[in-house]
UniProtKB/Swiss-Prot annotation:
UniProt record similarity statement: In the N-terminal section; belongs to the 3-hydroxyacyl-CoA dehydrogenase family.
Record-given protein name: Putative fatty acid oxidation complex trifunctional enzyme
Stretch list, region Enoyl-CoA hydratase/isomerase: 453-720
Gene Ontology terms for molecular function: 3-hydroxyacyl-CoA dehydrogenase activity; delta(3)-delta(2)-enoyl-CoA isomerase activity; enoyl-CoA hydratase activity; NAD+ binding
Organism: Rickettsia typhi (strain ATCC VR-144 / Wilmington)
Reaction equations catalysed: a (3S)-3-hydroxyacyl-CoA + NAD(+) = a 3-oxoacyl-CoA + NADH + H(+); a (3S)-3-hydroxyacyl-CoA = a (2E)-enoyl-CoA + H2O; a 4-saturated-(3S)-3-hydroxyacyl-CoA = a (3E)-enoyl-CoA + H2O; a (3Z)-enoyl-CoA = a 4-saturated (2E)-enoyl-CoA
CDD domains for the chain: crotonase-like
Keywords, sorted A to Z: Fatty acid metabolism, Isomerase, Lipid metabolism, Lyase, Multifunctional enzyme, NAD, Oxidoreductase
Length: 720
């Protein structure tokens, strides 16, 4: 595409601004990060420098790999405005005050190229107000891109445009957000709070205010929301703490100032004395001294506590016995929470449906927003349509009992037109393909003239049938002279071995069958590695244990940036048994530093936090990283790979080292030290070693560890 976005300027180096800059850097695009001049320091860029340093300190790292910081150029708004001239996109992420934003826009306009897009990351201010004083040639390329925090990990971006925006601007920003940054765009109308804040914050305030007024238990309410309505474990009050009470007050105040008095947000946002008192005592949530919940430490143990609203004291969270498993059971019960939730759900859906079509005329976008932005299992329309019996009729009946007027959407029964199929908006390529081979654990399919291997077990775990069919698939691909693609069913590449199967062999003392499974897996990995056609793995989510071994034996990997991969078998007291150990030795090939690192990968269960870390830590050179997990198959099919030059197994050089002297083993347990000694014996016995010999050692060590009580205990803990 011509005139694509190659360089971005982010203005505002707070948590959100620096997070967006890091996200752009993760995509290997150049980004300029600017903020105001620090007049109290000799260093004019102190504010931005501190923000960039903080990128390396956060619990959820904004950077996918430390050296991605090199894509960030820093500066200030007094000396470095010329840097904006190089940028195709400017994202403003400053304080939510209209006059200050207007001052900034006027300041940067002289430095903009004629086609540079300007985007505000506001979550509260309307697009119309932001651009009201701008020249027409700027208005036509001024938009809102509302990222969610933390930007690296949250998939959703709300995009707000109007009819003055040029089509090429919409196309350019859409491609950048989806293909380059890996986001899912939801287009919203220019209304207060857009979709996410208008819907989500209404529910948070509705529940919090009603629960406090009725003196109900926060823990019970949160658990009901999680179990019966599909909200994350944070529930309502945990999420309120996560967002921050001070931030919630700012959002709600902004919404109230923008919404007409007739809007129900005014009605439900009443008596804020408790909230104000909590803010006054710095009980603003996780970033304060507590919130509705807090974590305290007693005798070295963390204890979750819940607040007593009457005096702002805290007491330990007690286990709550909830007798209902879904919304139907809850609403049919005689619990005080049945009446509470009946009223909450009715008021919420009355408000929600009143927003159609003013906020958006697409109810599926509302659902997608709540699932992506708030991590709900169901979207609100999906919940009432699919997961609740007679859900819409119940809302209408309750509204009548509560003397609440129905919005047009409900009164005209628009909900009867809902297409249930649209709730699953992701394209299922399996519906457009032909099955070539299949068993109860995997399929080989023909899709767009390509052969694709799809594992169909839970979490794509590996067992005999997966390996049998994969070997057949490799043979079929070789016969056709076609590359073979391994693509995950669902969001994860593979969680590794079927541990339930392995534990059953151990418990039955059936170590011959266990060894046969190891041999089968090793043989399959050799099929992949030495195939005459390319094996191209499309990896997203997790690729752990055996899943990681599949990647290590592939010709090419197309991986989503957020891939979590690694040889983590030691977590259950085992070692990689399907060539993982052999691959770690082979990739070292005589290099002492690499061998030490690779041994630590195994012993310390190195589960990488990104594809970039996997590439570096596991010495993976044949990998393309893609920011959007939904496009990895498309990108894999586009790979222009030459005919494969088939390699043959070769001897692997082993450096003469003393492993214990090279690794800090002070925190290792007996099992870890035992395996280190096994590896040391291999190194001591051989100057060089064949893959076949290493595979034999691998099986022997695995089988020995499988008999250890610690291993059996760990397996039981995982399998249950």
């Amino acid at each position: 595409m011509q005139n694509e976005i190659k360089k971005v300027c982010v203005i505002g180096a707070g948590v959100m601004g620096s997070g967006i800059a890091a996200l752009i850097a993760n995509s290997s695009h150049r980004v300029v990060l600017l903020d105001i001049l620090d007049k109290d320091s000799n260093d004019p860029n102190k504010i931005v420098k501190n923000a960039v340093k903080n990128l390396h300190r956060q619990k959820l790292p904004p950077l996918s790999y430390p050296d991605k910081v090199n894509f960030i150029t820093i500066g200030n708004l007094e000396h470095d405005l010329d840097l904006i001239k190089e940028c195709n996109l400017v994202i403003e992420v400053i304080v939510e005050k209209l006059d200050i934003k207007h001052q900034l826009y006027n300041k940067i306009i002289p430095y903009l190229k004629e086609d540079t897009i300007i985007a505000s990351n506001t979550s509260t201010l309307p697009l119309k107000k932001l651009k009201e004083n701008l020249p027409n040639n700027i208005k036509s390329r001024f938009i809102i891109t509302h990222f969610f925090n933390p930007p690296r990990y949250m998939e959703l971006v709300e995009l707000i445009i109007d009819n003055t925006i040029k089509d090429e601007v919409i196309e350019k920003i859409s491609v950048f957000l989806t293909k380059i940054l890996g986001k899912t765009i939801i287009k919203c109308n220019d209304t207060p709070g857009f979709i996410a804040n208008r819907v989500g914050c209404f529910l948070l305030e509705l529940v919090a205010h009603k629960a406090i007024a009725q003196n109900l238990d926060f823990v019970t309410i949160d658990q009901i929301f999680s179990r019966c309505l599909g909200l994350p474990n944070t529930g309502i009050f945990g999420l309120y703490d996560l967002i921050g009470h001070d931030v919630m007050k700012l959002i709600s105040s902004s919404l109230l100032s923008a919404l007409p008095k007739s809007d129900d947000y005014h009605r439900i946002y009443f008596n804020t004395k408790v909230f104000d008192k909590m803010i006054e005592h710095n009980l603003i949530g996780r970033k304060g001294e507590g919130g509705f919940y807090r974590l305290s430490v007693s005798n070295g143990k963390k204890i979750k506590e819940v607040i007593n609203i009457s005096d702002l004291s805290y007491h330990p969270v007690q286990k709550v016995d909830i007798s209902f498993n879904n919304l139907d059971e809850l609403l049919a019960s005689d619990s005080i929470y049945s009446k509470f939730f009946s009223e909450i759900i009715t008021e919420f859906y009355i408000y929600l449906t009143s927003l159609v079509p003013s906020v958006t005329n697409n109810i599926y976008d509302i659902d997608a927003t709540m699932k992506l932005g708030y991590s709900w299992h169901y979207g609100p329309f999906e919940l009432l349509t699919i997961a609740v019996k007679n859900g819409w009729n119940s809302i209408i009946k309750n509204a009548d009992l509560m003397n609440i007027s129905l919005p047009k959407y409900l009164a005209s029964k628009e909900y009867q037109k809902i297409d249930k199929q649209k709730f699953n908006s992701k394209k299922d390529f399996l519906q457009e393909s032909t099955i070539v081979l299949a068993n109860d654990s995997a399929n080989l399919i023909h899709y767009c003239e390509n052969l694709i291997f799809v594992i169909t077990t839970k979490m794509n775990t590996l067992n005999h049938n997966v390996f049998y069919l994969l070997q057949e698939a490799v043979s079929k691909a070789e016969n056709y002279g076609k590359n073979l693609y391994i693509f995950p069913q669902g969001n994860n590449f593979s969680a590794g071995a079927d541990l339930k199967l392995i534990l059953s062999y151990i418990q039955d003392g059936n170590f011959d069958n266990l060894e046969n499974l190891l041999k089968l897996g090793q043989q399959t990995m050799r099929y992949l590695k030495y195939s005459s056609v390319h094996i191209i793995s499309c990896a997203r989510g997790v690729a752990l244990g055996g899943g990681c071994e599949l990647l290590l034996n592939s010709s090419y990997i197309v991986a989503n940036q957020e891939l979590n991969a690694g040889l983590i078998e030691f977590g259950v007291g085992l070692i990689p048994g399907w060539s993982g150990v052999t691959e770690m030795f082979a990739r070292s090939n005589g290099d002492k530093t690499k061998l030490i690192r690779n041994i630590k990968n195994i012993i310390e269960q190195n589960k990488t936090s990104s594809a970039d870390y996997f590439k570096a830590d596991y010495d993976v050179s044949n990998m393309q990283v893609n920011m959007n997990k939904h496009y990895i198959l498309d990108e894999a099919l586009k790979l222009n790979v030459s005919n494969k030059i088939v390699s043959i197994p070769h001897k692997i050089a082993l450096p003469k080292i003393n492993i214990v002297s090279e690794i800090d083993t002070s925190k290792y347990n007996d099992l870890q030290n035992k395996v280190l000694n096994k590896f040391q014996n291999i190194i001591d016995k051989h100057n060089e070693i064949s893959e076949a010999e290493l595979l034999t050692y691998e099986r022997e060590i695995f089988l020995e560890l499988a008999k250890e009580p610690q291993t059996i205990e760990k397996l039981h803990a995982i399998v249950g």
